[in-house]
Amino acid sequence: KGKGASMLIIGAVLMFVCHMIFAITPEQYFTPVVAYGAIVILGVSFSLVPAALWPSVPKLVENRYLGSAYSVIFWIQNIGLMTFPILIGWALSATNQGVANPTDYNYTVPMLIFAGLGVLAFIFGIMLKIEDKKKGYGLELPNIKK
């Protein structure tokens, strides 16, 4: 019930954990169970964040700006969808010089980039929670009040 900012923080931590599992697990310990477990963690993260994010927008933005707020969120998301494949491609090219077969690439750096995004999301989640406590937006309160 409620806990929007907390769910964002938990989702960010889970995203970090998942990508660090992919980045630093030694090859001899990287079994299908580990891989599937990391993907399940990522799935939970990807479920928590939108479930908390979208219902929180009306708590932060006046009703008359709500449509614009959602459009800005989609705009920023689409910028990320456009730029991050380029960034990851550049990172793969820079760290796998001389590797002809893409299935032989080392994906550690891209996973660390994604883990870093999890850290950034965690920091922003903490900042959001602090701001919510100061200004009383109600991000930690349920949307439906009895």
Task: Indicate residue ranges for each PLM-predicted region.
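A late C-terminal transmembrane helix in Major Facilitator Superfamily
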Residues: N63-Q97
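Juxtamembrane/transmembrane-helix interface segments of polytopic membrane transporters
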Residues: F22-P26, P85-Q97, K129, K133
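Alpha-helical transmembrane segments of multi-pass secondary-active solute transporters
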Residues: M7, A69, P110-I113
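Multi-pass alpha-helical transporter architecture, strongest
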Residues: A23, Y107-K146
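A membrane-interface helix-boundary motif in multi-pass transporters
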Residues: W90-G118
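Intracellular helix-loop hinge segments at the cytoplasmic ends of transmembrane helices
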Residues: W54-L60
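C-terminal transmembrane helical hairpin of 12-TM major facilitator-type secondary transporters
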Residues: G4-L53
